[in-house]
Amino acid sequence: MSLSVTRENFDEWMVPVYVPAPFIPVRGEGSRLWDQQGKEYIDFAGGIAVNALGHAHPALREALNEQANRFWHTGNGYTNEPALRLAKKLIDATFAERVFFCNSGAEANEAALKLARKYAHDRVGNHKSGIVAFKNAFHGRTLFTVSAGGQPTYSQDFAPLPPDIRHAAYNDLNSASALIDDNTCAVIVEPVQGEGGVIPATKAFLQGLRELCDRHQALLIFDEVQTGVGRTGELYAYMHYGVTPDILTTAKALGGGFPIGAMLTTQDYASVMTPGTHGTTYGGNPLATAVAGKVLDIINTPEMQNGVRQRHDAFIERLNTINVRFGMFSEIRGLGLLLGCVLQTEFAGKAKLIAQEAAKAGVMVLIAGGDVVRFAPALNVSDEEIATGLDRFALACERLQAGGASCG
């Protein structure tokens, strides 16, 4: 008989790095979740842009179960068929010629930064070690990636931090140009800053970074952990902008809810990562890669990408209607199904309160800082779920505007 647990047990037993919602989800289907009490929620959070095909998708369950009935793990001393098939699918679908599999976005970014440093050291010299990143970015929680993130809140308690990392202002090419020089080995950037407020890069900004990297022989890394695998209406956001990076990192939606990450690059850059220079025990395991292969099969189609663009329009239309009623947002922005509602000054700092009130109304949303409510729903969310979920979100906005919301 399984142990009966409650939300209070989290506070008793877990390291307190999170403050989870007061309810515990126990079952999901598509874009809906149910908690221990049987209450239904429409999920516009998507596990933070992870559940690209919703919960318990039949094809993903089938892929997982089929591989689970064969074998689960061998370690990196052996390869496996699902990993090789997934690598070929990613290569065929992108600019990449080589793939490194890992378990998360942080690990993918760690690998990308290490590759960039090693490539520069091997081809030029150890002096070429500088990394330029951007303020308010998010690249993961390892010491290297959290240092690149440019959010002191996440890194200041862990000094001394890795050296030679500098931060420019996002979408400001002059700021970046002032930092990128011949000693720069890499520039790492999110095509849309997710945690930083759902801020899409301008095309001119990314094109300018490409030109600066070419001029100074630095590698351009696109962190597509949040924007990748169909989220923006293209398989990867670099395709939306027409700017090709040297290295791309992907995770989150790649596994549709099963942990996996990957670093994609060209043969030339990958060649410096010789045996023993980097590795992972679980990366590229057959369970994860079998599921991810099925995710790509479903998402990498014109029908799915066109559907994302149509659902984007539906969200924008309804969010604008909500804003006409309540006047809470100064801007509604984003690409595809990664959207952010920026709060007016009157409601500054209340994004978390809105998210809490939304959950009470039966819809799950995210925040991106204190002033932005973020949406990252499943890419196959239905029209009915969009309508019902945003009706519930409107109710939360109404309650907050009326002063009836509380932090409880």
Swiss-Prot record:
Pathway: Amino-acid degradation; L-arginine degradation via AST pathway; L-glutamate and succinate from L-arginine: step 3/5. The keyword Transferase applies. GO terms for biological process: alpha-amino acid biosynthetic process; arginine catabolic process to glutamate; arginine catabolic process to succinate; ornithine catabolic process. Gene3D superfamilies: Aspartate Aminotransferase, domain 1, Type I PLP-dependent aspartate aminotransferase-like (Major domain). Its cofactor is pyridoxal 5'-phosphate. CDD domains: OAT_like. The keyword Transferase applies. It catalyses: N(2)-succinyl-L-ornithine + 2-oxoglutarate = N-succinyl-L-glutamate 5-semialdehyde + L-glutamate. Keywords: Aminotransferase, Arginine metabolism, Pyridoxal phosphate, Transferase. The modification N6-(pyridoxal phosphate)lysine is found at residue 252. It is an enzyme of class 2 (transferase). It comes from the Bacteria. GO terms for molecular function: identical protein binding; pyridoxal phosphate binding; succinylornithine transaminase activity. InterPro entries: Ac/SucOrn_transaminase_bac, AcOrn/SuccOrn_fam, Aminotrans_3, Aminotrans_3_PPA_site, Class-III_PLP-dep_AT, PyrdxlP-dep_Trfase, PyrdxlP-dep_Trfase_major, PyrdxlP-dep_Trfase_small. Its EC number is 2.6.1.81. Catalyzes the transamination of N(2)-succinylornithine and alpha-ketoglutarate into N(2)-succinylglutamate semialdehyde and glutamate. Can also act as an acetylornithine aminotransferase. Belongs to the class-III pyridoxal-phosphate-dependent aminotransferase family. AstC subfamily. NCBIfam families: arg_catab_astC, argD, PRK01278.1, PRK05093.1, PRK12381.1. This is Succinylornithine transaminase. It comes from Salmonella dublin (strain CT_02021853).
